[in-house]
Every structure is written in C-alpha cells, then in structure tokens.
C-alpha cells in the first residue's frame, strides 16, 4: 500500500512539475526519484481486473530513463516524460480500481488484488520515499493492530433514523404529546411537542429526552448546539405508528427550557453542558443524551393565548427543539465525512463495473446499513478501500 502511495505521489509531482521551460536543476531530485521508479518497475508484469465488468488488463514495464540537461526542459524531453507518466498513471488507476472492488471476511486490511500483493514485495520498497498521507499512516498502524486516528469534518457517524414516540395519544390523534427526531450524518434534530402546551403537566412543564448511541467512539469533538430544530418547524401530515391512519402536526415554536446535553463513554458521563449553546466540545464519547423542557408561557398576550387554549380543539401545537451537529472529531475507525470523497469514489467504481455483492459490504455500499452494522471485518475492508481511494484521488479526480 505504501508503495502504491509513493508511486502515485511521484507521478503526481512529475505531472505537475516536469513541464516545458522548467530548469532541470529545479526538478533534478524529482527526476532521480522518477528514474528510480522506472528502474524498479522495468521487467515486471502485472494483471488487473477480471471481476464484475472490470476488464482484464496486462501491464508490461520497459521504459527508458529520463536524461540530464544543463538547461531548461524542452518539448521533446517533456513529451518523453509524459508518455511514461501517462502509462504509469493508467496502471496506478487500474490497480486502485482492482483493489477497491475486492473484499474479504478475514484480514480485510491486507491487499486483496494480485497486483497490489505483488507491489507489496520487498524489491518494490525502493520506490517508497513518502508516507505522509494520513490514510497511509493509519493503514500501517491498523495493519500492525496499533491505535489509529482519523480527523473528520462533519463525520457521518449517525445512521439515518427518522421517527417519533408518543407519550400521550388517542385514537383521534387530536391531543398528542411526544418527541420526533431526525438523525443523519453528523446531525441530530429532535423536537418535543404537546398539543395542549403542557396545560395539565406538573408545573405546566413537559420533560423530553433523546438518547443516541454511536457505533464508534469519537474524541476531541467540536460540536454546535442550537435551541431549535428547523426541520420540525413547519406543518406536516405524519403516518401513525401502525400505519392505519395519519395525523396532523402544526407546530408553534417555543424556546426550550433547562437544556442539558451529556456525553458519555461506557455509561460514564464525560462532559455535561447546561443551557449552553453555540460551540461546545466533548473529549471522548459513545453516547449523547439530550434533555430539555417545554414550559407553558406563564404570561401570554391575547394573540399567544389564542394559540394555546385551555381546552380542545388544539389547532396549534407547542413545540421545542434542539439541533446538535458534530463539526469535527477524531475517530479510530474510518468514516465517510463532508470533506472527503472516498465513499463516493469507491461506490461509483463498484457501480460502474457492476461488481457483485461480496461477503462484507452491503449492496450499493449503503452507508446507513454499513455504519449500523460496523463489524471489525467491515472496518478493516473499509479502511483499506478508503486508503486506496485516497491514493487514486491524487491522480484521478
């Protein structure tokens, strides 16, 4: 894997810097590295593809070295280099695709394609000169079963979940109280509602709670907490739990009271915030507990009092909500996130070449399914294919 990364890094630098008019002295070190790559690869044969509709391709390496010059690189020099670069880039691209479409239930962190296994041989280590990639660093750590750490921006840690619970209901669905939520990606939105605006609740206060368990532990997380849930701020028709009917939700938004968010690890509270909004942090956690209250306004203007009558019918439904968004965090496991295209890269290649469903990944690389059942086997395979996708993205956008 590290050899594949170094190949890609060398080719990217060569493609960017070996251009007509450049002083040879400015790229002499790169050309020496480029020539070392050619020397190491010459005389070797590889085969890629042969799974799904990914075609079988044979690769043979027999290229001349780039020479030295005292002056600028001319058009002939650059054209010779380009022909070599293009072949090598095509080879790396196909090795990456061949690796990204394969999976294994055992030792899925190790190379799975014949071509990448061959590149792992000792003689190709002479190519290796750069392991600065976060993915390569973590792949080497995971391969040795040592602790890894990925930094993510808006990590997709929450499987998609959208539902509701009713703490008070009737067959007519005309005086409901409960919570509804939408968890997806890096965001939780939860709303508590009471059609009667807590008129019969103790002290005219309704208490709500929402608990979310993560599939992986996050550390050093930067989080945004807002006293609102905008996705639940407009009227909607909702299917009943048994699917037998529908009920109408017409929210009027109030500010939540006594808001508390707790971050827990193995059942122990690590961080707690009370009535604090905006940016907060959490050291390490695998569970988030949100609690908040809906308080009936003690003083209301006639217009507000008309929204919340003392008896039915309740045409407007008092609602309070919270939004929690994980902006960035560190995780030992690889995840999809907002700043990287690894999941899309892997999924698109598997779709384009009609790769059959294997023993590890769900059909279509469904992320909700994958993260909901994030087994060690899936973790190993996902880290490997994401590492390869990061290498491919250096050369192929």
Curated annotation (Swiss-Prot):
Q: Which family does it belong to?
A: Belongs to the rotavirus VP6 family.
Which residues are noted in the entry as Zn(2+)-binding? 153
What does this protein's UniProt record list under function? Intermediate capsid protein that self assembles to form an icosahedral capsid with a T=13 symmetry, which consists of 230 trimers of VP6, with channels at each of its five-fold vertices. This capsid constitutes the middle concentric layer of the viral mature particle. The innermost VP2 capsid and the intermediate VP6 capsid remain intact following cell entry to protect the dsRNA from degradation and to prevent unfavorable antiviral responses in the host cell during all the replication cycle of the virus.
Q: Where is this region: Interaction with the inner capsid protein VP2?
A: 62-73
Q: Tell me, which GO biological process terms does this entry list?
A: fusion of virus membrane with host plasma membrane
Keyword field: Calcium, Capsid protein, Intermediate capsid protein, Metal-binding, Ubl conjugation, Virion, Zinc
Q: How is it modified after translation?
A: The N-terminus is blocked.
What name goes with this protein? Intermediate capsid protein VP6
- The species this protein was found in: Rotavirus A (strain RVA/Monkey/United States/RRV/1975/G3P5B[3]) (RV-A)
Compartments, record wording? Virion
Record: residues binding Ca(2+): 266, 286
Query: What other note does the entry give for this protein?
Result: The VP6 trimer contains a zinc ion located at the center of the molecule. The zinc ion is not essential for either trimerization or transcription activity of the DLP. Zinc-depleted VP6 has an increased sensitivity to proteases.
Record's subunit section: Homotrimer. Interacts with the inner capsid protein VP2. Interacts with the outer capsid glycoprotein VP7. Interacts with the outer capsid protein VP5*.
Does the keyword field hold Plastid?
no
Q: Which GO terms describe its cellular component?
A: T=13 icosahedral viral capsid; viral envelope; viral intermediate capsid
Q: Name one GO molecular function term.
A: metal ion binding
């Amino acid at each position: 894997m590290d050899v594949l990364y170094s190949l890609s890094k060398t080719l990217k630098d060569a493609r960017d810097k070996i251009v007509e008019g450049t002083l040879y002295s400015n790229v002499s070190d790169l050309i020496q590295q480029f020539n070392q790559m050619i020397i190491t690869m010459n005389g070797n044969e590889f085969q890629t593809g042969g799974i799904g509709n990914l075609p079988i391709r044979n690769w043979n390496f027999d290229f001349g070295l780039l020479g030295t010059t005292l002056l600028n690189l001319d058009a002939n020099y650059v054209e010779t280099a380009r022909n070599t670069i293009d072949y090598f880039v095509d080879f790396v691209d196909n090795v990456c695709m061949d690796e990204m479409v394969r999976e294994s239930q055992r030792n899925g962190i190790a190379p799975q394609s014949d071509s990448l296994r061959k590149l792992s041989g000792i003689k190709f280590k002479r190519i290796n000169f750069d392991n600065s990639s976060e993915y390569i660093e973590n792949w080497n750590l995971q391969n040795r079963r040592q602790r890894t750490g990925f930094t993510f921006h808006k990590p997709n840690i929450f499987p998609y979940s959208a539902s509701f619970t009713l703490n008070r209901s009737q067959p007519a669905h005309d005086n409901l109280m409960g919570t509804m939520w939408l968890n997806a990606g890096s965001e939780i939105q939860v709303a508590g509602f009471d059609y009667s605006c807590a008129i019969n609740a103790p002290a005219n206060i309704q208490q709500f709670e929402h608990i979310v368990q993560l599939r992986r532990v996050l550390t050093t997380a930067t989080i945004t907490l807002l006293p609102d849930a905008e996705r639940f701020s407009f009227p909607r028709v909702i299917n009943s739990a048994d699917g037998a009917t529908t009920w109408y939700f017409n929210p009027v938004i109030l500010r939540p009271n006594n808001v508390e968010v707790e971050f827990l690890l193995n059942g122990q509270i690590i961080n707690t915030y009370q009535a604090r909004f905006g940016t907060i942090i959490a050291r390490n956690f695998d569970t988030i507990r949100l609690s908040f209250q809906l308080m009936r306004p003690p003083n209301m203007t006639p217009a507000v009092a008309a929204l919340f009558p003392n008896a039915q019918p309740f045409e407007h439904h008092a609602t309070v909500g919270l939004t929690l968004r994980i902006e960035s965090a560190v995780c030992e496991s690889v995840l999809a996130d907002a700043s990287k295209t690894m999941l899309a890269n892997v999924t698109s290649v598997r779709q384009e070449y009609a790769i059959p469903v294997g023993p590890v990944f769900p059909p279509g690389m469904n992320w909700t399914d994958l993260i909901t059942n994030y087994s060690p086997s899936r973790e190993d395979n996902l880290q490997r294919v994401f590492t390869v996708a990061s290498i491919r993205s250096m050369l192929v956008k």
